[in-house]
């Protein structure tokens, strides 16, 4: 498919997840409706990850595409009808007998994802070492956490140009090269092993490089170690605490077999969230989630949340923006050359600010323009004028004077306060 065809095919899929409930706003949101170019709901302004939008099939397609053309193709399967790669995530079902008075009932626990290891006991141990609220048990808080992190850590628009908004043919080409590069140089999937197994792998790898002369010495050294020494010789790369013998550890092939992590420590170095499904990006001695690895390589537009591949873009308020996306967060008018106010780290045009966000003057009860001087005390505001900032009793101007605040009123003296409050 040529670049022109790819560009024409692009779309944000506005029908996807339409009407899905917001997990954050609950009934306050009428249901998910995707903004034309922002990755947020038009109704409540929350992100896609805050809504119950993605189905398991859509998640598996996204991760399947991420693993396409990588060494992790064993984790995907291609659909016969359209050839789309699907992520073969490992679902683990544990059946635990529960004793009852007369008979034994069966308690079945389904994990929506589990480490793809042959030893189910090891996978069970891994899960138990995660915080309970982050264990992806079907229908639980942990399953919802995993779903949210899939959306947050691995945005589809960080790997698929067709999920982006109006890229030029040149930007499509640059993005494809960028994705190919990070798949080859940074993308990885963690593996769960016992620390001793990792040492064997590392020793085998060293033997390939240094010949057989070191083999007998290495084996002899391992045999001489007591159980206590074995338990203390491994430490977590993140928290530096010792690994307990018999506990599973996570390793990342790109980091090397000499580095281990506790299951709960296998997190992104930027957001400190568990790396969803142990999918990591390795750079300069650090683990990243997909989002924050990409952020370390490319500027990200604070408006549309996409990576910026254009040479020209705007920097404002410590953030980056596509030229066409530096817009009012409320009405989407372009803000280049206009007065704007930052509200919760989002730029808002002057009219929208006055209408929806401005402080109200206690004197005249009108909105206070962002460029006008004002007096603020606790949660009360006044225009800094002779007409508004007055004694609530005698109307004396209080600008530059001492005053006594009482429940939204201000007084020039104790006498005026007594008169008004009596």
Swiss-Prot record:
Taking every annotated instance into account, which residue ranges of this chain make up the domain PET? Answer: 92-199
Keywords tagged on the record: Cell junction, Cytoplasm, LIM domain, Metal-binding, Repeat, Zinc
GO CC terms, sorted: cytoplasm; cytosol; focal adhesion; plasma membrane; protein-containing complex
Q: What does UniProt say about this protein's domains? A: The N-terminal and the C-terminal halves of the protein can associate with each other, thereby hindering interactions with other proteins.
Q: Which organism is it from?
A: Gallus gallus (Chicken)
Ranges where the record places region Disordered: 198-224
- Tell me the protein family, please: Belongs to the prickle / espinas / testin family.
UniProt-recorded name of the protein: Testin
| Primary subcellular site in the record, as a coarse category | cytoplasm
Q: Which Pfam families match?
A: LIM, PET
Q: Which is one GO molecular function term here?
A: zinc ion binding
Listed Polar residues bias regions: 205-217
Q: What is the lineage of its organism?
A: Eukaryota, Metazoa, Chordata, Craniata, Vertebrata
Q: Where does the record locate the signal sequence feature?
A: none
What this protein is reported to do is described as: Scaffold protein that may play a role in cell adhesion, cell spreading and in the reorganization of the actin cytoskeleton. May play a role in the regulation of cell proliferation. May inhibit cell growth.
Where in or outside the cell it occurs: the entry states:
Cytoplasm; Cell junction, Focal adhesion
GO BP of this protein? negative regulation of cell population proliferation
Q: PROSITE patterns, alphabetically?
A: LIM_DOMAIN_1, LIM_DOMAIN_2, PET
LIM zinc-binding domain: from which residue to which, for each copy? 234-297, 299-359, 362-422
């Amino acid at each position: 498919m040529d670049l022109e065809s790819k560009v024409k095919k692009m779309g944000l899929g506005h029908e996807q997840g339409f009407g899905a409930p917001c997990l954050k706003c609950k009934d306050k949101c009428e249901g998910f409706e995707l903004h034309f170019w922002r990755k947020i709901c038009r109704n409540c302004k929350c992100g896609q990850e805050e809504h119950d939008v993605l189905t398991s099939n859509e998640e598996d397609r996204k991760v399947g595409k991420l693993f396409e053309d990588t060494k992790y193709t064993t984790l995907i399967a291609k659909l016969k009808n359209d050839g789309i790669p699907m992520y073969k995530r490992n679902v683990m079902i544990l059946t635990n007998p529960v004793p009852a008075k007369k008979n034994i009932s069966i308690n079945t626990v389904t994990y929506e994802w589990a480490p793809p290891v042959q030893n189910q006991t090891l996978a069970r141990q891994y899960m138990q070492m995660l915080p309970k609220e982050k264990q992806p048990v079907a229908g639980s808080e942990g399953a919802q956490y995993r779903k949210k992190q899939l959306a947050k850590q691995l945005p589809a628009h960080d790997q698929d140009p067709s999920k982006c908004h109006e890229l030029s043919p040149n930007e499509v080409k640059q993005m494809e090269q960028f994705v190919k590069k990070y798949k080859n140089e940074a993308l990885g999937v963690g593996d769960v092993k016992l620390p001793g197994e990792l040492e064997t792998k590392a020793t085998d790898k060293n033997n390939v490089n240094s010949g057989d002369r070191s083999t007998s010495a290495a084996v002899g050294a391992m045999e001489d170690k007591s159980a206590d020494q074995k338990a203390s010789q491994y430490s977590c790369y993140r928290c530096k605490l010792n690994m307990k013998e018999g506990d599973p550890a996570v390793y990342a092939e790109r980091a090397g077999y000499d580095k281990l992590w506790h299951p709960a420590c296998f997190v992104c170095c930027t957001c400190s969230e568990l790396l969803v499904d142990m999918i990591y990006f390795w750079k300069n001695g650090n683990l990243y989630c997909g989002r924050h690895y990409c952020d370390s390589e490319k500027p990200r537009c604070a408006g549309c949340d996409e990576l910026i591949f254009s040479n020209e873009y705007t920097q404002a308020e410590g953030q980056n923006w596509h030229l066409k996306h530096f817009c009012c967060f409320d009405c989407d008018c372009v803000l280049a050359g206009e007065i704007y106010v930052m509200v919760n780290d989002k730029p808002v045009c002057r009219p929208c600010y006055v209408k929806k966000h401005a402080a109200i003057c206690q004197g005249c009860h009108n909105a206070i323009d962002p460029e006008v001087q004002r007096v603020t005390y606790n949660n009360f505001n006044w225009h800094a004028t002779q007409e508004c900032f007055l004694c609530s009793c005698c109307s004396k101007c209080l600008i530059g004077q001492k005053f006594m605040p009482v429940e939204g009123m201000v007084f020039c003296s104790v006498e005026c306060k007594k008169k008004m409050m009596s």
